[in-house]
Amino acid sequence: GPLYFIYKIISVLKLCKTLEKEYPDNNFVPTFWLASEDHGEGEISKINIFGKSFEWEHSEKGASGKRGAVPYSKIDSELRELFKEDDQAQEILNIFTESYSGAKDLTHATRSYLYKLFGEYGLVVIDGDDIKLKGEFASIMKEELLNSSTKQKVSETIARYGQNYKIQANVREINLFYLGNNFRERIVKE
């Protein structure tokens, strides 16, 4: 959920530091892929802290990053009460409030929050829904759409290594989605 991605980022930052020591002639850039095109409501709309669940509701569908700002004010006072004796937690809540209160959508809010928390450590946040990034990726998307290239490569990899590893996700014939205002639909070959 929303707290786990912070743990993942800290792990990447630590890994980069370890690799820089082990390979001093190389530079390692901590990178976080912001899954702004995903739909993972269950992953992003609820946190559990000390057995208490905090959840934000929304009616929007489609890509999670395009959703309007998080209605955090509903849970802000509860979180502040929970951490009232912890100055560091209050500081993090202040950064969260500053990042999410004026943002136009979830992508901008989350990017702001991450840069405020981890920017000084060199974290780079990549937004999968960025139009320029998609432009660079256009030939790969075309290949996927016409030739199901991901399915072919993943099937080869599973055939080679599958018996030694648990498969985490099943590949589909076309691994692309059509995104529009308030919807996200899988592209299916007919």
For the regions a language model picked out, list residue spans one by one.
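N-terminal targeting/trafficking signals and adjacent low-complexity tails
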Residues: 1-190
